[in-house]
């Protein structure tokens, strides 16, 4: 968006006056006034330089918001690391931010710079409803995400089985329906022009009941729910950490490291990646042909019994805490009275070892998933905190005005600043994902630089 073009369009619109038949309907501000003289636009509240500067800043904000959130959508839909069902919430949230940038912010900017509403009565109602809808949907999305985080922490196994893409999509539809119900009143309660105003205006219902109900439904009630849910998540996480520290004991007599609650011990690092479990399989067990060769040697009289037994130990010796496993292997491989190795015993030990390895692998995967859930919960907590910081000043001052009117009214420039800070929140989520989440950062680099390299090759 080039700021000179936008400024020129605004100047042309101001010279033309309100469009269509709505101009006369909106009072003396449209077409010709009551005395029959030509319509004169209101005196500009900003200089030409200020108009160009504001248009440039907001234009950059719009472009940055659209590009950043489009990257989020592409990353979630194309990256294997981000294809978890719960990330569909982020796609829907990014879509709401894109709609704010394309359907709300340009008209808010024009209304601010021109000092009157140029776009007609019908679009005024639609614009106000969309404004409230997208803001409300953002916070209701965050509320649904906080509940998703809570259930994934407190009911990890059961909830993860239930959290399918279909269920997540149904929840997203419910979020948009709830937001639409909350934002519907502006369609029927917006006001056209305050008494005594010379120019058409577009604003929300100024009655106290609407101001307070919209602030509570669109902001304060969801914020309260999010705060309570995340406080509960923090308590559960703190309790689990305390329980885990109590379960950890000193190293055992065989030097075994303390184990975690899922028996993995130190296999999982802080980055959520599991160290591969030690595979206690001897070199002679790696080949079925080798096992058959040894059994044949044992049948011929056990002449190589001692050598076979010498091969049963691993190259590095038994790992900590695996003495019982090694004992079972040695006993199973010791030939019976007739110099024969029990085939049933060998198979049972092999089955036991394979089951142990599968259990360790399953525990490792679960540990990695839990670490990823923990990082995701932290990132979303940052997103929610930033959202509240951006929108709280506006909703607090707006509700304060609804209670005590002029006695509590803020200076108009400060109120408008709070209003635009709320809009800025739509551009911040991609930045938060980039800073705090390695999967998003890697995916953004892959999307941007891979396509750029393709362009250079062409």
UniProtKB/Swiss-Prot annotation:
<feature type="topological domain" description="Extracellular">
    <location>
        <begin position="115"/>
        <end position="124"/>
    </location>
</feature>
<dbReference type="GO" id="GO:0045907">
    <property type="term" value="P:positive regulation of vasoconstriction"/>
</dbReference>
<dbReference type="GO" id="GO:0031694">
    <property type="term" value="F:alpha-2A adrenergic receptor binding"/>
</dbReference>
<feature type="transmembrane region" description="Helical; Name=2">
    <location>
        <begin position="89"/>
        <end position="114"/>
    </location>
</feature>
<keyword id="KW-0807">Transducer</keyword>
<dbReference type="GO" id="GO:0030168">
    <property type="term" value="P:platelet activation"/>
</dbReference>
<feature type="glycosylation site" description="N-linked (GlcNAc...) asparagine">
    <location>
        <position position="19"/>
    </location>
</feature>
<dbReference type="GO" id="GO:0004930">
    <property type="term" value="F:G protein-coupled receptor activity"/>
</dbReference>
<feature type="topological domain" description="Cytoplasmic">
    <location>
        <begin position="232"/>
        <end position="379"/>
    </location>
</feature>
<keyword id="KW-1003">Cell membrane</keyword>
<feature type="transmembrane region" description="Helical; Name=6">
    <location>
        <begin position="380"/>
        <end position="403"/>
    </location>
</feature>
<dbReference type="Pfam" id="PF00001">
    <property type="entry name" value="7tm_1"/>
</dbReference>
<feature type="site" description="Implicated in catechol agonist binding and receptor activation">
    <location>
        <position position="214"/>
    </location>
</feature>
<dbReference type="InterPro" id="IPR000735">
    <property type="entry name" value="ADRA2C_rcpt"/>
</dbReference>
<dbReference type="GO" id="GO:0042803">
    <property type="term" value="F:protein homodimerization activity"/>
</dbReference>
<dbReference type="GO" id="GO:0098839">
    <property type="term" value="C:postsynaptic density membrane"/>
</dbReference>
<feature type="topological domain" description="Extracellular">
    <location>
        <begin position="1"/>
        <end position="51"/>
    </location>
</feature>
<dbReference type="GO" id="GO:0098978">
    <property type="term" value="C:glutamatergic synapse"/>
</dbReference>
<dbReference type="GO" id="GO:0046982">
    <property type="term" value="F:protein heterodimerization activity"/>
</dbReference>
<keyword id="KW-1133">Transmembrane helix</keyword>
<comment type="similarity">
    <text>Belongs to the G-protein coupled receptor 1 family. Adrenergic receptor subfamily. ADRA2C sub-subfamily.</text>
</comment>
<feature type="topological domain" description="Cytoplasmic">
    <location>
        <begin position="148"/>
        <end position="168"/>
    </location>
</feature>
<dbReference type="GO" id="GO:0045666">
    <property type="term" value="P:positive regulation of neuron differentiation"/>
</dbReference>
<keyword id="KW-0675">Receptor</keyword>
<keyword id="KW-0325">Glycoprotein</keyword>
<feature type="topological domain" description="Cytoplasmic">
    <location>
        <begin position="77"/>
        <end position="88"/>
    </location>
</feature>
<feature type="compositionally biased region" description="Basic residues">
    <location>
        <begin position="291"/>
        <end position="303"/>
    </location>
</feature>
<protein>
    <recommendedName>
        <fullName>Alpha-2C adrenergic receptor</fullName>
    </recommendedName>
</protein>
<feature type="topological domain" description="Cytoplasmic">
    <location>
        <begin position="438"/>
        <end position="458"/>
    </location>
</feature>
<dbReference type="GO" id="GO:0070473">
    <property type="term" value="P:negative regulation of uterine smooth muscle contraction"/>
</dbReference>
<feature type="disulfide bond">
    <location>
        <begin position="124"/>
        <end position="202"/>
    </location>
</feature>
<feature type="transmembrane region" description="Helical; Name=7">
    <location>
        <begin position="417"/>
        <end position="437"/>
    </location>
</feature>
<dbReference type="GO" id="GO:0051379">
    <property type="term" value="F:epinephrine binding"/>
</dbReference>
<dbReference type="InterPro" id="IPR002233">
    <property type="entry name" value="ADR_fam"/>
</dbReference>
<feature type="topological domain" description="Extracellular">
    <location>
        <begin position="404"/>
        <end position="416"/>
    </location>
</feature>
<dbReference type="GO" id="GO:0007186">
    <property type="term" value="P:G protein-coupled receptor signaling pathway"/>
</dbReference>
<dbReference type="GO" id="GO:0007565">
    <property type="term" value="P:female pregnancy"/>
</dbReference>
<feature type="glycosylation site" description="N-linked (GlcNAc...) asparagine">
    <location>
        <position position="33"/>
    </location>
</feature>
<dbReference type="GO" id="GO:0043410">
    <property type="term" value="P:positive regulation of MAPK cascade"/>
</dbReference>
<keyword id="KW-0472">Membrane</keyword>
<dbReference type="GO" id="GO:0043025">
    <property type="term" value="C:neuronal cell body"/>
</dbReference>
<dbReference type="InterPro" id="IPR000276">
    <property type="entry name" value="GPCR_Rhodpsn"/>
</dbReference>
